[in-house]
A protein has these predicted regions:
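Polytopic transmembrane helical bundles with strong interfacial aromatic enrichment
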Residues: 1-163
Length: 163
């Protein structure tokens, strides 16, 4: 029963991590495409809040429940699919802190534009591009992790099955 409870929490955390993360990402993209500093400042404030209070804790819950599930099943951390997913998770996590910082910076830049009555400058576009591409790579990693969790195979093992 403990295993099933942990697995349930692990899956819920994955849903929150992926769902809120993707939702935040898409909302800030949509807001930025308006080029309206007021819209961007408001959406970025909410995105920073949701990512800080929901998405980030979901990531910690993922790693804790994943570790407990591995311990409970007696599976070594060096099992190929486990180690691969853990490495990808850590890489995605390493992108996460800079993404949070960049989101906060985008919010501050948009708010400053609102307060001064100016339009967003090239500085905003540069920070936005970094944030955007870090998000692309982060979500690609998350898609791969979900595939690994479902199949219990590494990507190269799956490719080997297709060849």
């Amino acid at each position: 029963m403990l295993y099933l409870g942990l697995k349930y929490i692990h899956i819920l955390a994955a849903i929150f991590l992926f769902g809120f993360g993707m939702g935040s990402y898409l909302y800030l993209i949509a807001a930025s495409r308006t080029a309206n500093p007021q819209v961007i400042a408001h959406v970025a404030r909410m995105v920073v809040r949701f990512d800080t209070w929901i998405t980030t804790p979901a990531g910690f819950i993922q790693i804790i429940t994943g570790f407990l599930l591995i311990r409970l099943t007696g599976l070594p951390l060096t099992t190929e699919w486990v180690l691969t997913s853990l490495i990808i998770f850590l890489c995605v996590g390493a992108l996460w802190l800079p993404v949070l910082v960049l989101q906060k910076r985008l919010q501050q830049m948009a708010l400053s534009a609102v307060e001064t009555g100016r339009v967003l400058d090239d500085g905003y576009a540069g920070v936005y591009r970094k944030w955007f591409w870090m998000g692309v790579f982060g979500f690609l990693g998350m898609f791969v992790i979900v595939m690994i969790m479902v199949t219990k195979m590494t990507p190269w093992q799956l490719v080997g099955l297709l060849v």
